[in-house]
Regions:
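Helix-coil boundary/capping segments in enzymes
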Residues: 1-223
Length: 223
């Protein structure tokens, strides 16, 4: 079996809730050429980022299964709490539907915001027990309720990892938002080519320093 272990899936423009475009949180243009946020846009480089086209692309390239991770643009950092909860819940429901409709083709991830631990635990329980999602996607760093950037592996977030360990989840740690707390000009893809590696290294440093690989042996973690 050939498995794509790091895949992303974009919603079609009409699948994105209107409030997300109205508030410039995230949207796709009608021609499916760009994904956009306030003061940011990135080209959609291939039609296979969308569901039906991805299925065709997988068949053409003899890929049997794909692990679909959450969109990095929708980790919720910097959003108000109610907006963040709506965005994350929508994304998790979207991924759950993809997995439910195509269980032989996709294993999909879900996301929570580590800055609000209690609501994060509720969402983990919902995604695992109601939606049958088993891959928890987390950023290397998150913005806490005081406006401070913290590594995801922090004493404040330990209840999240305790629950992930209880459920035996796969946990995928993905770098993003580096330009929001690393004070350098965003040019020459430096945040993708250099600083994302540094973010992973920083996160991994605290993962091992705090002994989480030993404390949570049922939690399978990748960076």
């Amino acid at each position: 079996m050939r498995i794509n272990g790091h895949s992303h899936l974009l919603p079609y423009p009409e699948e994105i809730p209107a409030f997300m475009k109205e508030k410039e949180i995230f949207w796709i243009d009608e021609d499916r050429k760009f994904m956009l946020q306030k003061n940011w846009k990135r080209p959609v480089t291939d039609s296979s980022f969308f569901l039906h086209e991805k299925l065709e692309w997988m068949a053409k390239n003899h890929i049997d299964h794909a692990v679909v991770l959450n969109l990095s643009q929708l980790y919720g950092n910097g959003l108000r709490m109610e907006e963040m909860k709506q965005v994350l819940r929508w994304q998790n429901d979207f991924n759950a539907k993809v997995q439910a409709d195509h269980p032989d083709k996709f294993t999909c991830g879900f996301v929570i915001h580590a800055g609000f631990v209690r609501s994060a635990l509720w969402e983990i329980e919902r995604c695992v027990e109601e939606l049958d999602l088993r891959v928890l996607c987390l950023p290397t760093h998150y913005l806490d309720s005081t406006g401070t950037w913290r590594t995801i592996f922090d004493p404040e977030t330990e209840p999240i990892f305790e629950l992930a360990n209880h459920y035996g989840l796969a946990v995928e740690i993905h770098p993003y938002d580096g330009e929001k707390f690393i004070q350098l000009e965003n040019t020459a893809w430096r945040f993708h080519l250099v600083w994302m590696l540094a973010q992973c290294a920083d996160s991994y440093h605290f993962f091992t320093l705090n002994g989480y690989h030993e404390r949570y042996p049922n939690m399978r973690t990748c960076f």
